[in-house]
């Protein structure tokens, strides 16, 4: 339910604007979308919904899949008090990640999914779980963790200056990336191993982010690849990375 026709809370979606969209045909009913309005969040508090999700996962496992990359999984649990947050921008909204992921109870969902869907198939699972604190890493990865491993996002986020995808230093200061990489490698040692990345679909090409344009070439790209491959963990390559693909700016009309 909304507040006199207004959204229930002042939460901002990852793509900007309110996380709330009016349900067609209703004046004061809203649905929540952490990302695009075309992607309504599923209600994981509903046991029937969870059962259908598990049914679909197991169907795919029965087809012979070896595992899953589990995208945006830290958003499945919400703060059910539905409270407004202190605005963190001129739009009067606050980022939705502040009320997801860190909310008590998400582990219950993740453990249930592991026991029901992944353990019976000995599946490999790679969770997109950002900003997991050092003290709870063993809950997330390894033999007793929710996932086999999670992506090592922290080094790739060292370039961020603001809240948005485009708020970054480019090329990234090497010392910042080096510091985050060494720190991340150290804290993960006792918990298990991570999935190491240079880039993915949410971030700039590593060749452009880490290498100044005047230094772009075979040797600098080879060095970047070796830095990733020589880290402890499981290396993940994003399509195009194998040929050293760089960014390109496109002009387009609305």
Task: Please provide the spans of the model-predicted regions.
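Active-site and adjacent substrate-binding regions of carbohydrate-active enzymes
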Residues: 1-254
């Amino acid at each position: 339910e909304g507040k006199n026709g207004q959204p229930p809370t002042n939460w901002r979606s990852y793509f900007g604007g309110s996380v709330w969209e009016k349900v067609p045909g209703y004046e004061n009913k809203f649905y929540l979308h952490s990302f695009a309005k075309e992607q309504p969040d599923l209600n994981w508090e509903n046991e029937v919904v969870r059962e259908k999700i598990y049914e679909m996962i197991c169907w795919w496992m029965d087809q012979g899949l070896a595992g899953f990359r589990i995208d945006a999984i830290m958003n499945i649990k919400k703060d059910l008090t539905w409270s407004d947050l202190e605005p963190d921008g001129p739009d009067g909204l606050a980022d939705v990640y502040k009320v997801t992921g860190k909310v008590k109870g998400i582990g219950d969902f993740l453990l249930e999914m592991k026991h029901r869907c992944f353990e019976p198939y000995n599946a490999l699972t790679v969770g997109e779980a950002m900003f997991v604190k050092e003290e709870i890493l063993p809950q997330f990865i390894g033999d007793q963790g929710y996932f086999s491993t999670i992506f090592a996002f922290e080094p790739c986020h060292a370039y961020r200056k603001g809240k948005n995808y485009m708020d970054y230093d480019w090329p990234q200061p090497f010392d910042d990336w080096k510091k985050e990489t060494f720190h991340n490698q150290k804290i993960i040692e006792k918990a298990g191993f991570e999935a190491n990345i240079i880039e993915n679909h949410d971030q700039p090409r590593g060749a452009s982010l880490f290498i100044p344009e005047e230094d772009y070439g075979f040797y600098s790209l080879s060095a970047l690849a070796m830095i990733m491959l020589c880290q402890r963990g499981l290396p993940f390559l994003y399509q195009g990375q194998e040929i050293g693909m760089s960014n390109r700016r496109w002009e387009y009309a609305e």
